[in-house]
Amino acid sequence: MKIAVLSRNPRLYSTRRLVEAGVERGHEMVVIDTLRAYMNIASHKPQIHYRGKPLEGFDAVIPRIGASVTFYGCAVLRQFEMMGVFPLNESVAIARSRDKLRSLQLLSRRGIGLPVTGFAHSPDDIPDLIDMVNGAPLVIKVLEGTQGIGVVLCETATAAESVIEAFMGLKQNIMVQEYIKEAGGADIRCFVVGDKVIAAMKRQAKPGEFRSNLHRGGSASLIKITPEERMTALRAAKVMGLSVAGVDILRSNHGPLVMEVNSSPGLEGIETTTGKNVAGIIIEHLEKNGGPNMTRTKGKG
């Protein structure tokens, strides 16, 4: 197969590993800088050009689209779909998962366990919003934040009111969530490929920190997940429409709670921690399911 990898940086661990795994399995792998691809949106012959030449003959595309380039990245991926190229994850599913509020609304509709979450626009509603999530301590999250940036733990209602007012004053969209104390600053990253959780790791926040992101100095270790956690991760990925996803789960007193469904999960942490060839499993999934004109979104967007 001829497989495109949409990535800003060919030297990133995840991009490198996907290329290596594809080449090992006999595929032609081409890394394309997402922001340098440009489109000809013609009625009968949609095209993507790159460095002055049309991109042709691709069977599949692996999107590694960073959060900051979601809009343009999804447009490029959608153009590949219009050309009949099979996407590992579809543009519509990636756009859906990048909107944290929309994601939680979709997951809640399907009865998937979530932390109690509130969202409001007016400062007048802040006291009621805090009560809605069972009061302080609580967590405030900027909707556009990634890697733990823009996430604040407020120990008291007074502190929470001040922080929420400040964010609202800056015209930032935020959501307020109950703090799951029993999770102890740890979460579980379940790596979903197709209809299987192929790997899982526990991420533990460093002392004095509650955010378990590895980018924030958290540590990763092997973990055995329960059947309920496995089912929750698979259902969450399916609701979002993602074939490959990193589903972040908290262990609470009332079962597993989904924090986030990541459409472009990093490979370094999960491969290093579990010793699994995750990149190879992803390429294998593409071989079984992909091929020209097999995209489900063609014509739907």
Swiss-Prot record:
GO cellular component: cytoplasm
Sites where the protein binds Mn(2+) 1: D248, E260
Residues the entry annotates as binding ATP: K141, E178, Y179, D187, R211, S212, N213
Top-level taxon of origin: Bacteria
Documented EC number(s): 6.3.2.-
Residue ranges annotated for the ATP-grasp domain, each copy included: 104-287
GO biological process: protein modification process; SOS response; translation
Obligatory cofactor(s): Mg(2+); Mn(2+)
InterPro entries (alphabetical): ATP-grasp, ATP-grasp_RimK-type, ATP_grasp_subdomain_1, RimK, Rimk_N, Rp_bS6_RimK/Lys_biosynth_LsyX
GO MF term set: ATP binding; metal ion binding; ribosomal S6-glutamic acid ligase activity
Binding site for Mn(2+) 2: E260, N262
Binding site for Mg(2+) 1: D248, E260
Family: Belongs to the RimK family.
PANTHER family tied to this protein: RIBOSOMAL PROTEIN BS6--L-GLUTAMATE LIGASE (PTHR21621:SF7), RIBOSOMAL PROTEIN S6 MODIFICATION PROTEIN (PTHR21621)
Protein name: Probable alpha-L-glutamate ligase
Gene (UniProt): rimK
